[in-house]
Curated annotation (Swiss-Prot):
Residues 434-450 have a biased composition (Pro residues). It comes from the Viruses. Residues 320-331 have a biased composition (Polar residues). Residues 1-25, 141-332, 346-404, 418-493, 535-628 are annotated as: Disordered. This is 69 kDa protein. One of its GO terms (biological process) is symbiont-mediated suppression of host innate immune response. The keyword Mitochondrion does not apply. Disulfide bonds: none annotated. Residues 299-312 have a biased composition (Low complexity). Acts as a suppressor of RNA-mediated gene silencing, also known as post-transcriptional gene silencing (PTGS), a mechanism of plant viral defense that limits the accumulation of viral RNAs. Keywords: Host-virus interaction, Inhibition of host innate immune response by virus, Suppressor of RNA silencing, Viral immunoevasion. It holds the Pfam family Tymo_45kd_70kd. Belongs to the tymoviridae protein p69 family.
Amino acid sequence: MSNGLPISIGRPCTHDSQRSLSAPDSRIHSGFNSLLDTDLPMVHSEGTSTPTQLLRHPNIWFGNLPPPPRRPQDNRDFSPLHPLVFPGHHSQLRHVHETQQVQQTCPGKLKLSGAEELPPAPQRQHSLPLHITRPSRFPHHFHARRPDVLPSVPDHGPVLTETKPRTSVRQPRSATRGPSFRPILLPKVVHVHDDPPHSSLRPRGSRSRQLQPTVRRPLLAPNQFHSPRQPPPLSDDPGILGPRPLAPHSTRDPPPRPITPGPSNTHDLRPLSVLPRTSPRRGLLPNPRRHRTSTGHIPPTTTSRPTGPPSRLQRPVHLYQSSPHTPNFRPSSIRKDALLQTGPRLGHLERLGQPANLRTSERSPPTKRRLPRSSEPNRLPKPLPEATLAPSYRHRRPYPLLPNPPAALPSIAYTSSRGKIHHSLPKGALPKEGAPPPPRRLPSPAPRPQLPLRDLGRTPGFPTPPKTPTRTPESRITASPTDIAPLDSDPVLSVRTEVHAPERRTFMDPEALRSALASLPSPPRSVGIIHTAPQTVLPANPPSPTRHLPPTSPPWILQSPVGEDAIVDSEDDSISSFHSHDFDSPSGPLRSQSPSRFRLHLRSPSTSSGIEPWSPASYDYGSAPDTD
């Protein structure tokens, strides 16, 4: 810079406290360069302060200050990191600053005029300056929020000594100690007129709207016999489906109305209403401002009330004009054929509704069942419901299965706990006449594989199945082997008898069988005869759940072979036990000591030697626990 201070670092700073650099005049410009022959560091790192004692020392080296940029600073290259004020703020160097060119001014203009201040107020709590006169209109002034702070001054003559007004440079704007300089003007009093009940709060403004007087109508006494007019119920509205169908062999009746207490003659006493009557001409509205004329002397035009719906009933769909005096109000577009009418308009006949001219007798009867009916003829009612036989699980029945004595048992109706059905009791199943022997339990070897029973046919007479000799470790009781010979009626089944035993046949009525089965405790299992094909071989698994009982059967035969050579076997080796409850016998429950084991053989039509072993079965008439 030509006339400014050169900026460089590397020379010590000299200090001269005798000279003053307060006035940058041209007369001292030559001595200013000789005084500051060394350059002053103009850069000071922010955040660090240099003590004054170090700055006054003549041989202080400022080596830790960052260097300035290489090029000289101008008005366009100014870095805020390099302040222009000397960090020491020495009294000798306080007017030294970096500039583009040192301005030469007159020494007479160096003195700055001090800012004028407010004159000290004689009283700090005075409200107004001294040169402002108080208006005579408001002699008393108080604080806006604290009126007790400012006492009123009665005489202001000796206080106002200065006549020339002075403009103050600074005036407080806040009114914390006193009110503002502007005099407080009270708002104008708004007179609220309380004479009218509903007066406007703005008396100077015009009313936006005025209440119009209503039409004068004579006051009518309320009628005690009629309720006020109510809208028709929704049930009277026919809607888009039209009116409801009529009763058979009857004319159209008016829609039902809510029953209201009233006299029989409704023409003389009508409900009084303030609303005007509807105009007789369609499409014209009555004039509400026209006064009504009394029509009490005019007789009614019609003596009978029309049977159609009232005129206030709105029909949203059937907007067709008809004759005014028809008793049956029907649109002219409704055709007589119900199917043609409901097809294109209402869709499905049963789903969407019925036409207006359809009687109830013409409608199809509602279906009671949605399931399709089979074309097979009606069969005889089955004696027992279709249900599965007893499932194959090993447990004891909690209820007696058959009644006691065995003579009262129905023939061909023996079932086991595993769901197998037997047509006859084996030899020794029935107890002998006399006192029943005590029950006993016999151990037995491991159970043998068991097969389901075959159908023994429906013929009443077939030979008694003889018994197969079996031995037990304890009893050593033997019996004859059991085979089934061919029946007279069914050539498929055959029974081969090796040892004949006395047998007993008991004929029972099917009705007695049904009554005996119905007397069993609930829940009983299905008991009956298995019907299978003649050549069908049943699997060795438990019986299938699709077994059914025959609807009718010939006279039942109860075949109970009785003999001395009864077979005694273990209950563990048996299929099931029959438990009976004594209903009529005084002897109580009976238990057979000779559970029987028998096998049934099926002979095919081609060969008669085919024998299939039957699973052993035991019959227990006592209440001893079953281990099977």
